[in-house]
């Protein structure tokens, strides 16, 4: 058995031809979890050989538009194809706050198209199967596959002014994957990452660019994202074997700029494996690269 972790999008709100909006696909056998759905997620899933009807659930970390702009496309396309596959509504896992109303609104946006399709092909309007949970201050179970092999925990992360923001910990028979969502470096993600095999974490070069962004709106934006140097320190303290960087601020467009991300993480003291993410990068568990028997779950 293997579990794969595929980055369906590593970008930010600014559009990029190379990077779709944020998203991660975690797959174990026939269980497929999509975490977030930024712009072009549906197309990246198609490139990865994944159809919307195959998704076991969509997990939302928070409702910033760059993370949810393709939710409508996923839900609607799954509905359009349902007469072929019969898999029913898309399960959506999210905090029970603004998410239910958000999902309801996007499902009604294409009202004319829905009316036409219901008259001719579909059995009824598009729906989702909501799995809403209260914002948890400690890692809390929020979803489990029907086969019982894949379990998901969530915890609140620090992305204020966004209050309803969480990270996820996905456990399969092959190992543990953590997806931070958008957050500062924080104790909550550190706790979520203990004994994880792979941590997919957002990354912002705040320290390196501090003078450049001073007294600009970016100074505020950077304050609620994860500084790469601080992230390296946190990952080393927790003993993360493999750190995968995504939601890259700013977008690296050359090998030298990719190397700068790696250097920042090393400057923070991290000695494990680093992958600076790009769209459709895939990590397989059990890992093909042994991070060393002393790293996993080490508290320093």
Residue map of PLM features:
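Cap/insert and terminal regions of metallo-dependent hydrolase folds
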Residues: 167, 174-176, 184-278
């Amino acid at each position: 058995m293997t579990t794969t972790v595929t980055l369906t999008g590593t970008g930010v709100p600014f559009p990029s031809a190379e990077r779709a909006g944020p998203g991660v696909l975690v797959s174990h056998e026939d269980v497929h979890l999509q975490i977030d759905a930024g712009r072009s997620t549906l197309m990246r899933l198609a490139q990865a050989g994944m159809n919307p009807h195959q998704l076991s659930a969509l997990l939302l970390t928070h409702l910033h538009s760059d993370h949810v702009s393709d939710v409508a496309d996923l839900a609607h396309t799954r509905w359009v194809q349902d007469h072929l596959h019969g898999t029913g509504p898309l399960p959506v896992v999210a905090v029970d706050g603004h998410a239910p109303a958000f999902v309801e609104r996007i499902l009604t946006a294409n009202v004319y198209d829905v009316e036409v399709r219901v008259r001719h092909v579909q059995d009824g309007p598009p729906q989702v199967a909501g799995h809403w949970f209260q914002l948890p201050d400690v890692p809390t179970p929020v979803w489990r596959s029907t086969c019982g092999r894949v379990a998901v925990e969530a915890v609140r992360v620090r992305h204020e002014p966004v209050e309803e923001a969480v990270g996820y910990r996905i456990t399969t028979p092959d190992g543990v994957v953590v997806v931070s969502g958008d957050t500062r470096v924080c104790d909550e993600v550190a706790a979520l990452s203990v004994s994880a095999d792979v941590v997919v974490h957002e990354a912002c070069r705040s320290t390196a660019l501090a003078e450049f962004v001073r007294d600009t709106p970016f100074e505020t934006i950077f304050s609620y994202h994860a500084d790469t140097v601080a992230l390296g320190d946190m990952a080393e303290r927790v003993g993360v074997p493999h750190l995968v960087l995504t939601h890259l601020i700013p977008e690296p467009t050359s090998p030298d700029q990719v190397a700068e991300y790696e250097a920042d993480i090393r400057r923070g003291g991290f000695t494990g494996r680093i992958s600076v993410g790009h769209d459709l990068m895939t990590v397989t568990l059990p890992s093909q690269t042994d991070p060393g028997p002393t790293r996993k779950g080490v508290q320093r």
